[in-house]
From Swiss-Prot:
Belongs to the ycf54 family. This is Ycf54-like protein. It comes from Synechocystis sp. (strain ATCC 27184 / PCC 6803 / Kazusa). It comes from the Bacteria.
Amino acid sequence: MESWALTTPPIDIVNQYLFFIKRKTNYMATYYYALASQKFLLEEEPFEEVLKERRRDYGEKNKEIDFWQVIQPAFLNAPELAEAKAKAPEKNVAIVSTNKSFIVWVKLRLEYVLTGEFEAPSDAIPDPLASLD
């Protein structure tokens, strides 16, 4: 006799689906960011390893992923972020999160980052994770 077992999809797939649903239902949220040059964040500071470790930790705790890495973030083109864009390096990368504490931790760990926040989705920022790259 065959046995049928329910399988649970990996937490990463569930988190991506939940985030997709939130984005498609115009769920307004506050996003926090830490912005740095690509050279600093991707080459000089091995931050990708930190993000991998954090993702693993979230997965073990069945916690929804609330942070993303965005190269050349489009949100900087919003009029309300003109000042941040003026201060941003030409080739930049952002760590974006809905968790303010995580961005504060990033700022403390890295120091040389610009931080801020924005509301999305909005007319100026329809997709908070869009990249110009």
